[in-house]
């Protein structure tokens, strides 16, 4: 949260509820409703105690969609290891976590082409996580304009920063889950700068023209 400077904020629950990306006939939320939801957003209004959480704004609602799958994947991996499983893939849709290796070889994990259904890139992964956040995962079009599920907590609308997806390679899926969204919201330059400061984290950014950008050591994972 603090590294994103508010571009990523878990207190967007009211805003998330306004946008229905699963509707058969999607429609834009009312401008007044978005304005109202924005007043409930602000992670600095969260107070954590030993066993309780409170909000300075009683209308604030937390949404943990950006970390939930990663947390669950990590817990599944912990369980499998406890059961002495030494090779497995946990795939929660956009979140892939590998346990060990595949028959002594690395697992091959694809990154989806944002403009198609095939893979734009393949990675060799050993006992690590690969998480992607992209504008093609949940979206709709209204009057020719594209709206996706990664929402800007400052405007109430989808981010429009030239990025199509961000993929994070990490040891823990919860880290990759959060960082894929955080880095998307920061944009290419700031997002890559953040990743390059973090030990054990690599990233692949894809823009809306399908150009690829890599963190310092991400190409070490790419299958040529």
Regions found by a protein language model. Name each.
Residues 2-224:
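Mature catalytic core of soluble alpha/beta enzymes
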């Amino acid at each position: 949260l603090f590294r994103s400077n508010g571009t990523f904020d878990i207190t967007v629950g009211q805003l998330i509820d306004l946008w229905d990306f699963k509707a058969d006939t999607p429609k834009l939320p009312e401008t007044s409703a978005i304005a109202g939801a924005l007043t409930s957003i602000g992670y600095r209004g969260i107070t954590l105690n030993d066993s309780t959480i409170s909000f300075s704004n009683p209308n604030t609602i937390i949404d943990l969609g950006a970390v939930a799958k990663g947390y669950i994947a990590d817990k599944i991996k912990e369980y499998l290891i406890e059961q002495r499983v030494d090779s497995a893939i946990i795939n929660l849709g956009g979140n892939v976590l590998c346990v060990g290796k595949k028959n002594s070889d690395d697992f091959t994990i694809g990154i989806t082409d944002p403009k198609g259904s095939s893979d734009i890139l393949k990675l060799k992964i050993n006992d690590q996580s690969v998480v992607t956040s992209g504008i093609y995962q949940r979206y709709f079009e209204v009057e020719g304009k594209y709206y996706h599920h990664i929402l800007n907590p400052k405007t109430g609308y989808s981010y429009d920063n030239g990025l199509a997806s961000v993929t994070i390679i990490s040891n823990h899926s919860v880290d990759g889950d959060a960082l894929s969204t955080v880095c998307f919201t920061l944009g290419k330059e700031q997002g890559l700068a953040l990743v390059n400061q973090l030990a054990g984290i690599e990233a692949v950014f894809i823009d809306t023209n399908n150009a690829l950008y890599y963190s310092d050591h991400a190409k070490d994972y790419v299958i040529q």
